[in-house]
Design a protein with these regions (language model features):
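Extended, well-ordered alpha-helical scaffold segments
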Residues: 53, 107-123, 180-200, 269, ...
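Low-complexity, Ser/Thr/Pro/Gly-enriched N-terminal "stalk/linker" regions
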Residues: 2-90
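Well-ordered alpha-helical scaffold segments within catalytic/enzyme domains
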Residues: 33-46, 94-107, 166-181, 260-279, ...
Length: 463
């Protein structure tokens, strides 16, 4: 289960920090703007270990996971997760999103990100119910025997609502940074129409829709009950998600964090469609669905907890059943403000945040030094660095932010990188040594903290 480096993971254990980043000649993509940021961070941050980690983690997506080409004269970028040679709509969006701020200094980086947008558009049009794809339609997938409509070029066909939201977030972020509408052509508009269709199908007002999924597996997290469509829901306006961002099956199909994400993404898509394509009918439909989902969340997703008061449930069925928990994968309840789902001063979110970071969340784990959220995917006592990163990115005060960074600094187990998960009492027991999303997200956190004059001093106070 564990990838074990066998190296202690405290700052005191290192007399120096070895070179673990790929040599320049072996890097998949080179960005002068990112190299400049790394040099600036290392020069001005006194904490040598954090400088080393930033230099390794922030460029990891570019160094190791992106494959740029041009198809029919248009940028086309395939982005693998790291140790899995497949492109997840979710991961690929999150992996390159932190680079948006650097496009103005690096036009090649901008073209790379246009390529990601174009590739995601083509994948959504291929199958909006799939979560992960190959660049080669002839490549064999181990999931070919899944009982669902597998097509050539699909790695896995788990329907996850957030997989349709992340490409919108990336597209919107790109558009806002550049005011460039060139990637948002007729094909992109068709992809947005497809997203809208799937969201409406998965409101399940007129039956279960066309998607179902069953897998022959010993893992319960892959099991979708009721003939592969999931447990019954009351069609109250929310959107079903058969799987979570962790690729684990939902218990109750209305996955609350993903619905909040959809509220933000549908609103963003509406704005883009209205201003770029001038299709007011489609823009109005997108906005109307966003409002419908938001209102349903406020009506059905809020529960009264005996200790924390009003909080958002993790999953619900619309009949009154609710699952109170949180998972480390994003979108989760912890990350709602980060993704634009709620305002950071939302009172119910504040209560929810305290709940998910407590022993009342069955997947919150606390060791002698480390604490954080894990999930069903890896199991008991395994903390995901992503949860610590997201707690820091939504931090309420300096002490909380600094504590998260200090814990993250001590999780790398000598590898110089973040991992998928680590044991609450022993970071040397970790999963996935090459997980680019966590690396880039950690880099985003450090760069954001470093560049904010309100928090800049905290970087140099970390030990």
């Amino acid at each position: 289960m564990f990838a074990n480096s066998g190296v202690a993971s405290t700052a005191a254990s290192f007399s120096s920090f070895p070179t673990v980043r790929k040599p320049i000649s072996e890097r998949n993509f080179k960005s002068p703007a990112i190299e400049k940021a790394i040099a600036t961070f290392k020069q001005k941050v006194k904490n040598e270990e954090l400088g080393w980690l930033f230099g390794n983690c922030f460029p990891n997506t570019l160094d190791t996971t992106v494959f740029y080409s041009e198809k029919d004269g248009r940028p086309d970028t395939y982005v693998i997760t790291g140790d899995i040679d497949a492109m997840w709509l979710r991961d690929s969006s999150a992996q390159v999103y932190p680079y948006l701020d650097f496009m103005s200094e690096d036009k090649n980086l901008q073209r790379l990100i246009i390529g990601v947008i174009n590739k995601q558009t083509s994948f959504i049009l291929k199958d909006p119910y799939a979560n992960a794809f190959y660049d080669d339609d002839t490549k064999y997938t181990r999931w070919n025997s899944d009982h669902t409509e597998m097509k050539p070029g699909i790695h896995e066909r788990k329907y996850e609502l957030d997989s349709l939201c992340y490409p919108i977030r990336l597209a919107y972020g790109y558009w806002k940074k550049t005011n460039d509408a060139s990637p948002f052509d007729a094909q992109w508009k068709k992809a947005i129409e497809t997203v809208l269709r799937v969201c409406k199908e998965q409101q399940r007002k007129d039956g279960n829709g066309p998607y179902s999924f069953r897998r022959t597996s010993e893992w319960a997290i892959d099991a979708v009950p009721m003939g592969g469509v999931g447990y019954k829901v009351n069609p109250v306006g929310l959107i079903c998600s058969t799987f979570r961002p962790s690729d684990d099956a939902t218990i109750f199909p209305f996955l609350v964090p993903s619905n909040f994400f959809a509220v933000a993404s549908l609103r963003q898509a509406s704005e883009m469609v209205q201003k770029i394509t001038k299709d007011n009918v489609l823009a109005d439909e997108l906005l109307a669905l966003s409002k419908e989902v938001y209102n349903a969340l406020q009506t059905y997703a809020v529960v009264n907890h005996p200790k924390f008061g009003k909080i958002y449930a993790f999953e619900i069925d619309g009949f009154g059943s609710a699952y109170l928990s949180d998972d480390a994968n994003v979108p989760n309840l912890l990350a709602l403000p980060y993704l634009g789902g709620v305002d950071s001063d939302d009172a119910i979110y504040a209560n929810t945040r305290r709940f998910v970071w407590s022993e009342y969340n069955p997947y919150f784990f606390k060791g002698s030094y480390f604490e954080g959220i894990g999930g069903h995917h890896i199991g008991t006592d395994m903390i995901w660095p992503m949860s610590l990163i997201m707690k820091a990115l939504t931090a309420q005060d300096d002490e909380e932010l600094q504590r998260c960074i200090q814990m993250l600094q001590k999780t790398h187990a000598g590898t110089g990188f973040m991992h998928e998960s680590f044991h609450k009492d022993d970071p040397k027991k970790f999963t996935r040594s090459w997980f680019a999303w966590a690396n880039t997200l950690f880099g985003e956190l450090l760069w954001k903290t470093f560049n904010d004059w309100n928090t800049n001093h905290l970087i140099n106070q970390c030990k």
